[in-house]
Regions:
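Eukaryotic serine/threonine protein kinase catalytic domain
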Residues: 1-147
Length: 147
């Protein structure tokens, strides 16, 4: 997919996620199959079956979602605020749109997540989770505009 088209779709995905996070809802299963396009090629996020309501200061612990798109802390069964896992999944979707393949693949979930370096996890954590554990539960504004 071309970068301009991927940028347009990604902007709309992030906008939809930010909107749901403002409503205190985290999707938890973002993947291309749950990103639909209408007749005008506008993104519609679908399948909120694994979504959860989030509260400031509370954490989620359920391991859910599609392993190839789920954040490492979800697969490990760790705690998470919520919005950061949608950001991770969005990043994987962007990678797939631009490269045509997943960044990490394996049939075994443990091997899959061992392929994601600790440094990569920490970088994504630092960039995407700046406010997640302070109770704000919103995407950092620095990643929204992609112009």
């Amino acid at each position: 997919m071309s970068e301009p088209r991927a940028r347009r779709f990604f902007q709309q995905i992030i906008s939809g996620i930010e909107y749901s996070h403002r409503l205190k809802i985290v999707h938890r299963d973002l993947k291309p199959e749950n990103v639909l396009l209408d007749d005008d090629l506008n993104v519609k996020i679908a399948d909120f079956g694994l979504s959860n309501e989030i509260s400031d200061g509370d954490f989620l612990t359920t391991s859910c979602g599609s392993p190839n798109y789920a954040a490492p802390e979800v697969i490990r069964g760790g705690i998470y605020a919520g919005p950061e896992i949608d950001v991770w999944s969005s990043g994987v979707i962007l990678y797939v749109m631009l490269c045509g393949r997943l960044p990490f693949e394996d049939d075994d979930v443990q091997i899959l997540f061992s392929k994601i370096s600790r440094e990569c996890q920490l970088l994504l954590f630092a960039v995407c989770l700046a406010d997640a554990f302070t109770g704000r539960g919103q995407l950092p504004h620095s990643i929204v505009p992609l112009t």
